[in-house]
């Protein structure tokens, strides 16, 4: 066993973290040989709840978990980190405009970005989950100029997994049989789930999803809407936002950063758009298809984009540009 790595989870007393921490601590993400120190950050009023989470983690008696550090202080939380998973954000309250939500979160992610810049390792990998995830991630990155912007990514893997699962359900196969779906753009209802390049294994034969499903109107209509609105559907049914599925998606996302993507497969994650070949404006945190090797992601290049896709990709880029402009305005005054 090597040296322990330091992993931070923010919003650590919350729903998603409760599903996530056990998976990380038992080795599902960084492997069964990698010891770790878990650092748990939350706001001061949540410290008592967080103590309960720490007790439970201790009571799991997990061999890889060397230490658990609960804190409400950024200088403790961000010190010498290898990985930061930023789950905590200001939730949208009833009657709250998206603009108000952005303003509250710019403040949080400016502060956390600055703390990463000051205290974390320069090689730290930062994954932003708290919504609006793409723009929060961009703000954190801009507030941490000494950390490469390629080290920042945001979670669209939940949308990616939702898309895989809908295709699998439609065809009566397992999600494992579906690969190379793409989520383009924002983790919002403008995201574009694209299966033009996706493949499915049907009775041992790999075929394109359009060819396998033979229902273009579903693929261009209800399928896209279902994935775009899935989060809202879960809230409506459960009265709480997705936690178990979000935690699983975070594990998938971070494991792929750590160990790389399987040969012949690509995944979706929100990354900085600089240098992309898909006509997405620079300096946006936009979800693309990527492959990962040696902890470094690269865009999947050369995928043909039809007019239907182009329109959807531009629409979500427009929303992200507007979000960014609003956030950057707040950033200068935060």
UniProtKB/Swiss-Prot annotation:
<keyword id="KW-0816">Tricarboxylic acid cycle</keyword>
<dbReference type="GO" id="GO:0006094">
    <property type="term" value="P:gluconeogenesis"/>
</dbReference>
<dbReference type="InterPro" id="IPR001252">
    <property type="entry name" value="Malate_DH_AS"/>
</dbReference>
<feature type="binding site">
    <location>
        <position position="112"/>
    </location>
    <ligand>
        <name>NAD(+)</name>
    </ligand>
</feature>
<feature type="binding site">
    <location>
        <position position="131"/>
    </location>
    <ligand>
        <name>substrate</name>
    </ligand>
</feature>
<dbReference type="Pfam" id="PF02866">
    <property type="entry name" value="Ldh_1_C"/>
</dbReference>
<protein>
    <recommendedName>
        <fullName>Malate dehydrogenase, cytoplasmic</fullName>
        <ecNumber>1.1.1.37</ecNumber>
    </recommendedName>
</protein>
<keyword id="KW-0520">NAD</keyword>
<comment type="function">
    <text>Catalyzes the reduction of aromatic alpha-keto acids in the presence of NADH. Plays essential roles in the malate-aspartate shuttle and the tricarboxylic acid cycle, important in mitochondrial NADH supply for oxidative phosphorylation. Catalyzes the reduction of 2-oxoglutarate to 2-hydroxyglutarate, leading to elevated reactive oxygen species (ROS).</text>
</comment>
<feature type="binding site">
    <location>
        <position position="98"/>
    </location>
    <ligand>
        <name>substrate</name>
    </ligand>
</feature>
<keyword id="KW-0560">Oxidoreductase</keyword>
<dbReference type="InterPro" id="IPR001236">
    <property type="entry name" value="Lactate/malate_DH_N"/>
</dbReference>
<feature type="binding site">
    <location>
        <begin position="11"/>
        <end position="17"/>
    </location>
    <ligand>
        <name>NAD(+)</name>
    </ligand>
</feature>
<feature type="binding site">
    <location>
        <position position="105"/>
    </location>
    <ligand>
        <name>NAD(+)</name>
    </ligand>
</feature>
<dbReference type="InterPro" id="IPR022383">
    <property type="entry name" value="Lactate/malate_DH_C"/>
</dbReference>
<dbReference type="InterPro" id="IPR010945">
    <property type="entry name" value="Malate_DH_type2"/>
</dbReference>
<dbReference type="GO" id="GO:0005615">
    <property type="term" value="C:extracellular space"/>
</dbReference>
<comment type="subunit">
    <text>Homodimer.</text>
</comment>
<dbReference type="InterPro" id="IPR015955">
    <property type="entry name" value="Lactate_DH/Glyco_Ohase_4_C"/>
</dbReference>
<feature type="active site" description="Proton acceptor">
    <location>
        <position position="187"/>
    </location>
</feature>
<feature type="binding site">
    <location>
        <position position="162"/>
    </location>
    <ligand>
        <name>substrate</name>
    </ligand>
</feature>
<dbReference type="GO" id="GO:0005829">
    <property type="term" value="C:cytosol"/>
</dbReference>
<dbReference type="InterPro" id="IPR011274">
    <property type="entry name" value="Malate_DH_NAD-dep_euk"/>
</dbReference>
<keyword id="KW-0963">Cytoplasm</keyword>
<feature type="binding site">
    <location>
        <position position="92"/>
    </location>
    <ligand>
        <name>substrate</name>
    </ligand>
</feature>
<comment type="similarity">
    <text>Belongs to the LDH/MDH superfamily. MDH type 2 family.</text>
</comment>
<dbReference type="InterPro" id="IPR001557">
    <property type="entry name" value="L-lactate/malate_DH"/>
</dbReference>
<dbReference type="InterPro" id="IPR036291">
    <property type="entry name" value="NAD(P)-bd_dom_sf"/>
</dbReference>
<dbReference type="GO" id="GO:0006108">
    <property type="term" value="P:malate metabolic process"/>
</dbReference>
<feature type="binding site">
    <location>
        <begin position="129"/>
        <end position="131"/>
    </location>
    <ligand>
        <name>NAD(+)</name>
    </ligand>
</feature>
<dbReference type="GO" id="GO:0030060">
    <property type="term" value="F:L-malate dehydrogenase (NAD+) activity"/>
</dbReference>
<dbReference type="GO" id="GO:0006099">
    <property type="term" value="P:tricarboxylic acid cycle"/>
</dbReference>
<dbReference type="Pfam" id="PF00056">
    <property type="entry name" value="Ldh_1_N"/>
</dbReference>
